[in-house]
Amino acid sequence: MSEKIYDVPAEWAKRAFVDDAKYQEMYARSVNDPNGFWKDEAQRVDWIKPFSVVENTSFAPGNVSIKWFEDGVLNVAANCIDRHLKDRADQVAIIWEGDDPSESRKITYRQLHDEVCKMANVLRNRNVQKGDRVTIYLPMIPEAAFAMLACARIGAIHSVVFGGFSPDSLAQRITDCASKVVITADEGLRGGRTVPLKANVDAALRKSSAVDWVVVVKRTGADVFMDDVRDFWYHEAAEMVTTECPVEPMHAEDPLFILYTSGSTGQPKGVLHTTGGYLVFASMTHQYVFDYHDGDVYWCTADVGWVTGHSYILYGPLANGATTLMFEGVPNYPTNSRFWEVIDKHQVNIFYTAPTAIRALMQGGDEPVTKTSRKSLRLLGSVGEPINPEAWEWYHRVVGEDRCPIVDTWWQTETGGILITPLPGATKLKPGSATRPFFGVVPQIMDADANVLEGECTGNLCLAKSWPGQMRTVYGDHARFEQTYFSAYPGKYFTGDGCRRDADGYYWITGRVDDVINVSGHRMGTAEVESSLVAHPQVSEAAVVGYPHDIKGQGIYAYVTLMTGVEPTEALRKELVAWVRKDIGPIASPDLIQFAPGLPKTRSGKIMRRILRKIAEDESSTLGDTSTLADPGVVSELVEHRQNKRHV
C-alpha cells in the first residue's frame, strides 16, 4: 500500500479558494452548524422564492425522509443559463469535440439559451408538462445537453439512458418510469463505429407501450425507420418554434431527474434526485474540488448517461458559469494520443477522467502522452472507482509532469456529488487515497456488528448525516430505498463500499461489499448478469462475481451450470458472452466464463459467493471453512478448473 505523500504546491495553497486552515474551519462549521453553513452555501443559486427551512431529514427506521430547502422555489435551467446572460452571453458554455477529430463546435451561453428553449418548446408542443418523464437515449452530442436542460426548464423529469445499453435494458427503464417521450438519434458514433440508437429504441418500444412520441436527432444521416404517427425529426420540429420559453418555477423538492443504477437484486433502481439541494451541491463541489476559476476550461470525460456526466459535465459547471467540454469519442481513437491532443486543441486546464482510461492508456506507454504539450493543464481528477497507486503515479508523473495535483474523488450515483476528496490547495495527497470528507459529510466506518470504529480501522463505509445532494428515494419504491441503504446500519446511510481509515484520518475505498461489481467505473449488479445468463435455454444456473482486472479494475467472472446433456464448448462460451452483450449491453459482457457442474451452496440452498469470489481472485488458499456446504467436493472441482490461474 502506497504511503508516499505529496505536499500541496506553494502556489496552489496561495491561489486556491480553500487552503488547509480554511478547510478545517469550513469543515468544522459544516458539521457543528449545518443549518448556518448550508443556508450560506445555498446562496450560490438564484431562488425565485427564498427558502426558510434549510434541512428536514430523518434516517430513522421506517421514517427515512430527506428534504433540503423545501419551501424554496427555483429553476435549474435558469441557474445554468439565463442568469449568466447579463455578464457572459458571449462566453463559451460548451465546447463539443466530436468522435472524428475534424468535428468540433463552440456554443456560447446565448446560443445555449436559444437551443434549450427550442428543445423545450418542441416538448411543450407535444404536451410534455411538469412532472412528465422523458427518456433521453442520445450519443454525446450537444443535443443531449439541450434535452436535459430543456426538461429542467419546463419541469419535466429526465431519465438519461447510456447509449451502450441494449433495447431490453432501455425498455425496462422506459417502462419503470412510464416515459411519455423518448429523445434519441438516428445513430451514435463511438471510436469510428456507428451505434444503432434509433433501431434500439424501435426494438425497446415493442416491449414498452407507454411512449407517445419519439424525437429523433439527425447525427449520421443514416436511413432509419420512422413511425408515421409516433416519430418525428427534431430538426424539422425545431424550425417551427421560437427561441423564448418561460421557465417553470420548481419547488426545491420537485424531482429533477431519475438515473437508473444497477442493484444487487437485478432490477435496476431509479435513483431520484430533486432540484434545489442537488444543484447547490453540484455547483459547490465543482467549484471547490476542481478549484474552478473564471476563464478555466474544464473537461470531464464521462458520458451524460452516468451521474458524473450529469453533475460534472452539465449541472455543476454550468451553474458556475463555466466552460465545459463534451467529448463524443473514446480515449484511443484515432490514436492513443487523443485525450492529450484534445487538451492541447482546446487548452484544457482541468481534466477529470476514470482510472480505467488511465490504466488503458498507461499500457500504451509514455510516448503518446509526451509527444503532446499539455502545458495548459493545472489539475487532474479521477472518478468512478478506486485508483491503484501505480496508475496514480503514472497519471501524476507522465500526464501532469509532476506539477498537477490529482483529486481522487469518491462518490456515487446516489450521492449526487463528490463526498470524499482532496481539495487541491488544502490536502496533502497519498496515491490511491480519496483522503478527507467534503464539507458536511460525516463518514463512519462500521464493523460487522454495527459498531462504529474509531481511529485506524477497516470496515464498511456509512454516512451519519444527510447532505443536500443525497438521493431522495428509489423512483416508485420508497420501501426499496429504505431496505437498500438504511436497513443494514439503522440510522445511517450504508454506501455498499468497504473502506480503510489510516493513521492520518485519510480514507481508502477498498471496493464493493455487496453483490455489485464495478466494471470500468460503472456499477453492474451481479444479479442482472446472472438473470441474463439463466435466460439462455442451455443454462440451468449461473453465479457472477467480480475479479481483479488490470484495465477495468474489476472484470466479470461467471460460473455457469449447463442443462443436463449440454456439453461445455468454446463455441457455447462465446455464444453466452454475445447473449449477455445483446441482452444488457457491451458493458455487462462476461470476461471469463467457467463451466461448473455444480455451485457451492449451503444446506439451505444459498450460493456461497464468498467462495466463488476467492476462486475467481485465484485466492483459493484462503477459502476458509467449507464444511458447512451441502457438497464440499464442488469446491475442489471449481478450483481445479478456474479461469484466472496465477498460482499453480
Curated annotation (Swiss-Prot):
EC number: 6.2.1.1
Pfam families, per the entry: ACAS_N, AMP-binding, AMP-binding_C
Binding sites annotated in the UniProt record for Mg(2+): V534, H536, V539
Presence of keyword Cell membrane: no
GO molecular function: acetate-CoA ligase activity; AMP binding; ATP binding; metal ion binding
Necessary cofactors: Mg(2+)
Binding site for ATP: G384, E385, P386, D408, T409, W410, W411, Q412, T413, D497, R512, R523
Positions of CoA binding: R190, G191, G192, R193, T308, N332, S520, R581
InterPro entries, A to Z: Ac_CoA_lig, ACAS_N, AMP-bd_C, AMP-bd_C_sf, AMP-binding_CS, AMP-dep_synth/lig_dom, ANL_N_sf
Reaction catalysis annotation: acetate + ATP + CoA = acetyl-CoA + AMP + diphosphate
Keyword ATP-binding tagged: yes
GO cellular component: cytosol
Listed GO biological process terms: acetyl-CoA biosynthetic process from acetate
Residues where N6-acetyllysine is found: K606
Reported modifications of this chain: Acetylated. Deacetylation by the SIR2-homolog deacetylase activates the enzyme.
SUPFAM superfamilies on file: Acetyl-CoA synthetase-like
Keywords: Acetylation, ATP-binding, Ligase, Magnesium, Metal-binding, Nucleotide-binding
Chain's role: Catalyzes the conversion of acetate into acetyl-CoA (AcCoA), an essential intermediate at the junction of anabolic and catabolic pathways. AcsA undergoes a two-step reaction. In the first half reaction, AcsA combines acetate with ATP to form acetyl-adenylate (AcAMP) intermediate. In the second half reaction, it can then transfer the acetyl group from AcAMP to the sulfhydryl group of CoA, forming the product AcCoA.
Family: Belongs to the ATP-dependent AMP-binding enzyme family.
Protein name listed in UniProt: Acetyl-coenzyme A synthetase
Organism listed in the record: Rhodopseudomonas palustris (strain BisA53)
Name of encoding gene: acsA
